[in-house]
Amino acid sequence: MTCFKLCCRRDLFAFPYPVAIWKEPPRSIEVVRDLVESYGIEQIYTVGDIVTTNFLKYSLAPTSAAVDGKTRRGLKIDKPTFFRKTIEVYNPPGYITEEAWIAVEEAVRDNVMIKVNGEEDMLSLAFIKLAPPHSVVVYGHYMGALIAIPVDWYRDAICKLFEYLEKC
């Protein structure tokens, strides 16, 4: 069983790890495109409605994505039709439920949009742990930055955050 619940040190999860791009789209997407091209990134995983929408809008299609249909800015986001398959899961705030974990396992193998009933934020951690080599996980930071995590370089360090999660 793979289910995790945030139990302490929420502040560590709000930190802008490690490549924070403080630019608006389309420039922020161009920076990620440069990262992808320069370092041989083969898979892109996006977490968040606005991030996923911007990647599709500016022609840097993610391999898979996780969205929850909500944005901090209150914008209505249409369901992207780019993905081959959609998986719907329940994942409350501060959790990575077992069904969400299983959906991420499938998403790193195929072109999947995970539609979350609840909150998708913590799924970035599941993507970082499960993504294959030569991947980048990208999500929006609540203060406005685009966060890009090349998993080959940062997976081990960021997966230490699992120490602050309890199994559920």
Curated annotation (Swiss-Prot):
The entry's keywords: Coenzyme A biosynthesis, GTP-binding, Kinase, Nucleotide-binding, Transferase
Positions with a binding annotation for GTP: D49, I50, V51, D68, K70, E120
Catalysed reactions, as listed in the record: 3'-dephospho-CoA + GTP = GDP + CoA + H(+)
EC number: 2.7.1.237
GO MF entries: GTP binding; kinase activity
Pfam families hit by this protein: DUF359 (PF04019)
Keyword Transmembrane (UniProt): no
Secretion signal span: none
Biological processes per GO annotation: coenzyme A biosynthetic process
Entry-linked InterPro entries: GTP-dep_dephospho-CoA_kin
Pathway(s) the chain acts in: Cofactor biosynthesis; coenzyme A biosynthesis
PANTHER family xrefs: GTP-DEPENDENT DEPHOSPHO-COA KINASE, UPF0218 PROTEIN TK1697
Similarity annotation: Belongs to the GTP-dependent DPCK family.
Described function: Catalyzes the GTP-dependent phosphorylation of the 3'-hydroxyl group of dephosphocoenzyme A to form coenzyme A (CoA).
Name under which the protein is recorded: GTP-dependent dephospho-CoA kinase
Organism: Pyrobaculum islandicum (strain DSM 4184 / JCM 9189 / GEO3)
